[in-house]
């Protein structure tokens, strides 16, 4: 993987990631394909939304169907028929999400499989091997996602464990030609975040991610971290904000120098009838859409908006038809990709401030200040 910085506008960056499997223009949003599929989407439909790269879930794919099944097809790209780059998370966040079902030790994490209840162990070495077997283009280190809230002592212990696991991840990654990203932890504590970043810089990674956000903290706490952390990261490496978020969160991350994002929000919200449009969120199951013959979003060029009315989408939602979720997902993912394309163009042209002002004005909101 190579990263080229093409333009800046304030803290915001316009870049390009180049992989053997394709080019990713940044800032970029990656749809989440947890089980080897972006829910409700054919690979050609994902590509048609403008997505250049997707995310796969190491933890879930390891448990089911297992890497032997996937390797029987070649790798995850062959298994799911996605030809572009794939980033895989390490499994750390999913293990964190198991709560009382898991035990964390220096070696790694032992937990009861959510698939069949069997006792399972995963550590840095296992995570690196699974991601190698998946044929990931970007591999994430195995880390512990610091919970929220966490006082400084708890966050320090967690961050230091993640740094030790980062070293083991780097060793286990070995001669794998895929990119390896470190993950900055430390909770909401600036001194710990800075120490985590210093430790990761000493180990050496191809890119760096910001972990431990969007885990229940108030938005102002997340913004506080983003006000200082991306600017401390190496300028010649991509910066990835994990698991975030709403369109507003993407805009605020880009304004502060983040290059890559992923989140289940556009796909999950689509299945619940919450559709993103320029003015905010449209709830398609509301009764007043029953007789609305207008397109979902007249400014959107997706298949859904070009072909179907709000009344039809409302009908599908009320009937529980799977086509409704599919059409909603096509639109939400296209909306996110159009937003990212607009941000890239604005940075390139040096007009990001005007773009951001217009983005918020359409929502009837003031532009938040930059910290």
UniProtKB/Swiss-Prot annotation:
GO MF assignments: metal ion binding; tRNA-guanosine(34) queuine transglycosylase activity
Binding site for Zn(2+): 300, 302, 305, 331
GO cellular component, one term: cytosol
Keywords: Glycosyltransferase, Metal-binding, Queuosine biosynthesis, Transferase, tRNA processing, Zinc
Catalytic activity from the UniProt record: 7-aminomethyl-7-carbaguanine + guanosine(34) in tRNA = 7-aminomethyl-7-carbaguanosine(34) in tRNA + guanine
EC primary class: transferase
EC numbers on record: 2.4.2.29
Renumbered residue ranges of the record's region RNA binding: 243-249, 267-271
One Gene Ontology biological process: tRNA wobble guanine modification
Stretches that traverse the bilayer: none
Cofactor note: Binds 1 zinc ion per subunit.
Pathway this chain belongs to: tRNA modification; tRNA-queuosine biosynthesis
Positions bound to substrate: 89-93, 143, 185, 212
Necessary cofactors: Zn(2+)
Active site: 89 (proton acceptor), 262 (nucleophile)
Domain of life: Bacteria
Record's function text: Catalyzes the base-exchange of a guanine (G) residue with the queuine precursor 7-aminomethyl-7-deazaguanine (PreQ1) at position 34 (anticodon wobble position) in tRNAs with GU(N) anticodons (tRNA-Asp, -Asn, -His and -Tyr). Catalysis occurs through a double-displacement mechanism. The nucleophile active site attacks the C1' of nucleotide 34 to detach the guanine base from the RNA, forming a covalent enzyme-RNA intermediate. The proton acceptor active site deprotonates the incoming PreQ1, allowing a nucleophilic attack on the C1' of the ribose to form the product.
Subunit (UniProt): Homodimer. Within each dimer, one monomer is responsible for RNA recognition and catalysis, while the other monomer binds to the replacement base PreQ1.
Assigned protein family: Belongs to the queuine tRNA-ribosyltransferase family.
Name the UniProt record assigns to this protein: Queuine tRNA-ribosyltransferase
């Amino acid at each position: 993987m190579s990263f080229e910085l093409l333009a800046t506008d304030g803290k915001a960056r316009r870049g390009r990631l180049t992989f053997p499997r394709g080019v990713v223009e940044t800032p970029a949003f990656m749809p989440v394909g947890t089980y080897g599929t972006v829910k409700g989407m054919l690979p050609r439909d994902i590509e048609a939304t403008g997505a250049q790269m997707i995310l796969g879930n190491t933890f879930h794919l390891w448990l089911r169907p297992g890497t032997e099944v996937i390797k029987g097809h070649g790798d995850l790209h062959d298994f799911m028929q996605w030809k572009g780059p794939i980033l895989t998370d390490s499994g750390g966040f999913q293990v964190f999400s198991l709560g009382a079902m898991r035990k964390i030790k220096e070696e790694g994490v032992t937990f009861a499989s959510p698939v069949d209840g069997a006792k399972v162990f995963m550590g840095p070495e296992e995570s690196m091997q699974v991601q190698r077997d998946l044929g990931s283009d970007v591999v994430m280190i195995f880390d512990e996602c610091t919970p929220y809230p966490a006082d400084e002592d708890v966050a320090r212990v967690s961050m230091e464990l993640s740094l030790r696991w980062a070293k083991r991840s780097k060793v286990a990654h070995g001669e794998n030609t895929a990119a390896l990203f470190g993950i900055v932890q430390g909770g909401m504590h600036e001194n710990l975040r800075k120490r985590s970043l210093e430790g990761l810089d000493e180990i050496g990674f191809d890119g760096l991610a910001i972990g431990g956000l969007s885990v229940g903290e108030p938005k102002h706490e997340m913004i506080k971290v983003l006000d200082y952390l991306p600017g401390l990261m190496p300028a010649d490496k991509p910066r990835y904000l994990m698991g975030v978020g709403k369109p507003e969160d993407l805009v605020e991350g880009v304004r502060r120098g983040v290059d890559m994002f992923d989140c289940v929000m556009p796909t999950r919200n689509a299945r619940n009838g919450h559709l993103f449009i320029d003015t905010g969120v449209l709830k398609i199951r509301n009764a007043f859409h029953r007789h609305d013959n207008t397109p979902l979003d007249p400014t959107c060029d997706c298949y859904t908006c070009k072909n179907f009315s709000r009344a039809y989408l409302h009908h599908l939602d009320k009937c529980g038809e799977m086509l409704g979720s599919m059409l909603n997902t096509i639109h939400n993912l296209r909306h996110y990709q159009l937003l990212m394309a607009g941000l890239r163009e604005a940075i390139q042209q040096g007009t990001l401030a005007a773009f951001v002002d217009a983005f918020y004005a359409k929502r009837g909101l003031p532009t938040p200040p930059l910290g």
